[in-house]
Amino acid sequence: MVQDETVEQNWYEDDNEGEVGYSFKEYDVTSTPNDFNTKTIIDFIESGLFKIPGFQRNYVWDIKRASKLIESLIIGLPIPQVFLYEEGKNNYLVVDGQQRLLTIYFFSKKRFPKKDKRFELRQIFEENGKFPDEYLYNDDYFDDFKLKLNDTTILEKNKLHGINYATLGEFKNSFDLRTIRNIMIKQNFPSDDDSAMFEIFNRLNSPKLSSFYTLHFNFFRICF
């Protein structure tokens, strides 16, 4: 157990030590934009249409950062687009945007993963394609997800602070129907590998990767 926790802590590092190397290669890639609302995204995650590939890191956001994303969606501010790689028909791997997608999913379930359980939860998700209810509603693994937001001014409290998905009230439709841009990527050439997925991930994320995670990503790319 101590070993797992040590590994998990390394996944949270956030330094700028080096970039992942790559070889020069030309690609033929089709990129298709799609705007999905949050309810559709939640359905896609639950049905296994959106998958988290093995080279992705754990869920690392804290409750404050997660709450700011949900607040942005509710009040109508744009958030960064999500990149998805088409591995097969109705089968998409999340290249960039895992933290945002899982935050939306967790909020809809009114549950937030405990930091010391995220390494184990990652394995559970990979094995099941989702978070089974026996874990999702187990207080040993998850806390209640209530928005944790700062007051808007000294004299005015943030009206969204402390609420969860069930208590959104007048804001529920705003959250449920808010659309997020998703870029669906399909590699046409080369046709014998998925290397475009790794290159896109590398170029979007390499400045944010820890030295531990860079080694993990390189190993996964070589093996697969």
Which positions does each model-derived feature cover?
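Short Pro/Gly-enriched beta-strand edge/turn motifs at strand-loop
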Residues: 47-52, 63-65
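Basic- and aromatic-enriched surface patches that contact anionic nucleotides/nucleic acids
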Residues: 4-7, 12, 24-32, 55-60, ...
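N- or domain-start disorder-to-order transition segments that initiate the globular core
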Residues: 16-49
